[in-house]
């Protein structure tokens, strides 16, 4: 009985030392990287020739494309990415999924998206949408 009590006490002590909090993504982890969109809400993205992408430059300058090109200054705070003054071209695309993704990325960056970076996978998520990207830097 003493061994069981000692084991339970030790287990509780060790569990108290483990943190389940996620570590927030930092600007340095995103800057100078390009990511290509793989899925929206778990469903694969189809594109003809130019895959939807997002890139992060100096001072968190964001640029990318869905159907249209977009760019703006991003802000990353407590794991949330925003870009309030996002500029975007406005052309209609033949692919309706890409047209809808223009609205999705614009809304996400305006309202704020939770960012997760695990290995080579970037996830931007809100209560309504989840965009999953794969690291695809142009140069190694």
UniProtKB/Swiss-Prot annotation:
GO biological process, one term: response to heat
Domain of life the protein comes from: Bacteria
Keyword list, A-Z: Stress response
Annotated Pfam families: META
Coiled-coil region list: none
InterPro entries hit by this protein: DUF306_Meta_HslJ (IPR005184), HslJ-like_sf (IPR038670), Hsp_HslJ-like (IPR053147)
Protein name per the record: Heat shock protein HslJ
Source species: Escherichia coli (strain K12)
């Amino acid at each position: 009985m003493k061994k069981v009590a000692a084991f339970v006490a030790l287990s509780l002590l060790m569990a108290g030392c483990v943190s389940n909090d996620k570590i927030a993504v930092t600007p340095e982890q995103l800057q100078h990287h390009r990511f290509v969109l793989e899925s929206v809400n778990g469903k694969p993205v189809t594109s003809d020739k130019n895959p939807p992408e997002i890139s992060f430059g100096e001072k968190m300058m964001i640029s990318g494309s869905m159907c249209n090109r977009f760019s703006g200054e991003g802000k990353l705070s407590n794991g949330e990415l925003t870009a309030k003054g996002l500029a975007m071209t406005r052309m209609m695309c033949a692919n309706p999924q890409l047209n809808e993704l223009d609205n999705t990325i614009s809304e996400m960056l305006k309202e704020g998206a939770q960012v997760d970076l695990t290995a080579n996978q970037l996830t931007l998520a809100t209560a309504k949408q989840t965009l999953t990207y794969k690291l695809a830097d142009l140069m190694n």
